[in-house]
Amino acid sequence: MAVIGAPKGHDRYRDPKTHQMTPALYRVRAPFFWKNTIGLAICTAIPLGVYMYTLHMLSKDEFGDIPIPPISDTELTKLKKEYEASKNQN
């Protein structure tokens, strides 16, 4: 089977001993640095903008117009007992 790529032990973009980037790899990546940085800024700004818009719209929302259904006193005491029992178990 044929081996694809550089010969074993030979990598022109990484130092074989330290595995650090060589100057050749820095030169190859240099033209793409600013384009990638701009792309990262755009890809970060879109979800951040959606999040900030959603947070802004939710902070203005009033929940006072939503009616709360009435609860009877017996049902309230039953729920309190269930809550206390679950709190004591933890």
Curated annotation (Swiss-Prot):
InterPro entries cross-referenced by the UniProt entry: Coa3, Coa3_cc
Keywords for the protein's UniProt record, in alphabetical order: Membrane, Mitochondrion, Mitochondrion inner membrane, Transmembrane, Transmembrane helix
Subcellular localization(s) per the UniProt record: Mitochondrion inner membrane
Membrane-traversing stretches: 32-54
Coiled coil: none
Topological type in the membrane: Single-pass membrane protein
Record bears the keyword Transmembrane helix: yes
GO-annotated biological processes: mitochondrial cytochrome c oxidase assembly
Mitochondrial intermembrane side: 55-90
Main location: mitochondrion
Mitochondrial matrix-side positions: 1-31
Function text: Required for assembly of cytochrome c oxidase (complex IV).
Subunit and partners: Component of 250-400 kDa complexes called cytochrome oxidase assembly intermediates or COA complexes.
PANTHER family for the chain: CYTOCHROME C OXIDASE ASSEMBLY FACTOR 3 HOMOLOG, MITOCHONDRIAL, CYTOCHROME C OXIDASE ASSEMBLY FACTOR 3, MITOCHONDRIAL
Family from the record: Belongs to the COA3 family.
The protein, known as: Cytochrome c oxidase assembly factor 3, mitochondrial
Species this chain originates from: Scheffersomyces stipitis (strain ATCC 58785 / CBS 6054 / NBRC 10063 / NRRL Y-11545)
